[in-house]
């Protein structure tokens, strides 16, 4: 492969993480598993630099490790019908994040920094159960975090996770919130439970917890822990050999664990059930779109195109 030209030799904030995922279900049946993966932690302002500097990383172009802006949060103001203003605009993840945060009352300036912890495409395939955005002001002050939760139906739902008032951890500030899920993630978890997001700014060590809770009880504990690695061609190859086709491994593990839960007799919920509880979803599945269309028709509202996220109140103001 031809040598990739470098843009500069400035130190990068972007990195990789060699990590371990743990799931421990407490109710209604005990179930436990864990496995190793690797993730990318990408400074959104360094994506083009990484594309130029690395042989095995590409932005919006085919490569072994590939980041596509369109795999993540769509711009809420550009996801409707094409018009003169947006028909030629390419997806831009930072612009999309700024627009969504603005709807939540949070201003992310152009010179503010964002780290995105995510699974990139590996050999062209991607599946992300959850990605995390860590937003920092240009001054270095922590602003907020966003959890972008995906599911096997291709939907996305972002959750705003505010700065936690507790003292900073060893690697930086933490973020936490307990918020109603109102989203179909697993067929074995009700829609009306809450997510308890406990996020630590990625540093030398990675520690994230996302638990399912209901009426003060933990139903499912999930942790993501790991160690920081440099983002270099050599490290990309090493981790790719140690965790081959990791994105395929993740989606395969999801279906395998679902089979095990079904065999254990854990109650199962269809996605078409409770569509009224699936709120604030981007790229909504047809089951939600059809339910919304029927509701709109019955109400004779005639408003909205249905191409953006389905309506949802600010989760920060919902009672859990």
Predicted segments with their positions:
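Mature, function-bearing regions of proteins
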Residues: 2-291, 308-320
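Long, low-complexity Q/N-rich tracts
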Residues: 291-304
């Amino acid at each position: 492969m031809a040598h990739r030209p470098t843009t500069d030799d400035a130190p990068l904030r972007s990195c990789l993480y060699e990590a371990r995922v743990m799931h421990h279900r407490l109710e209604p049946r005990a179930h436990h598993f864990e496995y190793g993966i690797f993730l990318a932690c990408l400074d959104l302002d360094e994506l083009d630099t990484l594309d130029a500097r690395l042989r095995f990383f590409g932005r919006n172009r085919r490569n072994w490790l590939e980041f596509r802006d369109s795999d993540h949060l769509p711009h809420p103001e550009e996801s409707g019908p094409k018009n003169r203003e947006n028909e030629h605009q390419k997806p831009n993840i930072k612009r999309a994040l700024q627009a969504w945060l603005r709807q939540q009352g949070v201003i992310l300036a152009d010179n503010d920094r964002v780290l995105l912890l995510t699974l990139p495409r590996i050999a062209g395939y991607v599946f992300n159960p959850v990605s995390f955005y860590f937003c920092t002001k240009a001054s270095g002050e922590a602003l907020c975090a966003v959890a972008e939760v995906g599911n096997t139906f291709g939907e996305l739902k972002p959750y705003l996770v505010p700065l936690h008032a507790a003292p900073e951890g060893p690697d930086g500030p933490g973020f936490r919130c307990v918020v109603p899920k109102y989203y179909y993630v697993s067929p074995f978890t009700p829609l009306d439970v809450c997510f308890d997001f406990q996020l630590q700014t990625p540093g030398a060590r990675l520690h994230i917890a996302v638990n399912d809770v209901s009426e003060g009880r933990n139903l499912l504990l999930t942790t993501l822990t790991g160690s920081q690695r440099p983002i270099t061609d050599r490290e990309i190859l090493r981790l790719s050999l140690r965790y081959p086709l990791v994105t395929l491994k993740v989606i395969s593990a999801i279906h395998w664990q679902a089979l095990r839960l079904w065999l254990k007799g854990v109650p199962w919920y269809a996605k078409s059930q409770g569509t009224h509880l699936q709120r604030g979803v981007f790229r909504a599945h047809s089951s939600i779109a059809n339910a919304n269309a029927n509701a709109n028709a019955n109400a004779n509202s005639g408003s909205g195109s249905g191409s953006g996220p389905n309506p949802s109140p600010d989760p920060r103001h919902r009672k859990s």
